[in-house]
């Protein structure tokens, strides 16, 4: 609305000679309100990156609509889903239904309508997707199921594209994103072949993109905003400790035994090329490196075992995210190219977390782990916006979350709020490895930092507080990338308490 039009609306009797003064008096408060509603200005930031993860969309949340969805083109799905009489958002312990998905995507647009780039760090499909489909449709024909999976992927892509029409949207596969079930994605397999066109169109790239998506579920592309910055997307499902088990239990997937080493070789070549071309690199992937702190703490009860327990029993309870060989080699690559790799982005854990990698010093490596949209693990749905500088370094980030999950639906809209801005909440100058390492140290020594970390970890959810006995296991995962490093923090430490994470 123009100044004159706003004046006529707000002060219709205003004399023309007073319009300039009136314009200032009327619009200055509006400008101040608008500035307050948006994100805070970032130091030297030139663009914003929108990151979402772990949607785990379940189009079958209302079983009465499934037959129509099966028969329809993805372009017709929204009309069908809008007919659902189940109006409530998915709640804690559930994957994302249509109402939550729509609300989350709309909140992303409101928070940042024109990001330089959108990243989705994996897991489009709901947990137990094959089982749910079979239980509702009673259709055991593999071709029918695969068609429904592909329609689901295409529908999510359509919804993202509808809201971010002119923006590159980058996907990376999650462990649930496959026809054959969890952790069973295959190099050159049917799922990667069938989704290549969708992933390429979202990324607004050409055929070279499709080739590496099909073969490895990975790709390399130039940053759309920053000259001299490259983005490498890695299908880290191949490196998962659970990938080998899945490959032997899903006979519908043809597993390439060399996929993990092929991916590492591909990464090493791309990093070498980037260094030679004087490019900087962002990495994105689904499963982060290091130790699964949640899985580790649950089978090993430190309280019942005593203060420190048996070192042997503690060590055997440690659950790695990746096969140790791939973790060690990845760690070595990050150390070798620490001046090239500027940041890494991951998902998978559903919580707001981070990893600090390598020794102290310049260019400390780190991984930002993005919160999930799905509230299945009792955290609040969330997403983040990252501000980056012209040289590819990160200035800051702001996390948004759904504040009224259990009450949203029907006439009650979802209330998405800014949860925190990194530099302000943690009182650090910028988003980098040094700041994250400082926070890691403060969590161990200051109760206020520890409590803040735990609060943000669950995206401000109080649905399932973290037991005191589990805190140290989660804390040690921040810096304990390898199993020996994690054990030295977790297994040899005193039982966690208020003074010791």
What are these regions (language model features)?
Residues 73-183:
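Core catalytic region of metal-dependent phosphoesterases/phosphodiesterases
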Residues 23-33:
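Bacterial N-terminal signal peptides
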Residues 1-19:
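N-terminal secretory signal peptides that target proteins for export/translocation
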Residues 142-158, 192-197, 260-267, 323-330:
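Well-ordered, non-membrane alpha-helical segments in soluble/globular domains
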Residues 51-53, 116-123, 164-174, 283-286, ...:
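Active-site neighborhood of phospho(di)ester-bond hydrolases with catalytic His/Asp-centered motifs
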Residues 40-120, 191-230, 235-273, 277, ...:
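Metal-dependent phosphoesterase/phosphodiesterase active-site architecture
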Residues 58-61, 126-129, 171-182, 240-242, ...:
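Active-site environment of divalent metal-dependent phosphoester hydrolases
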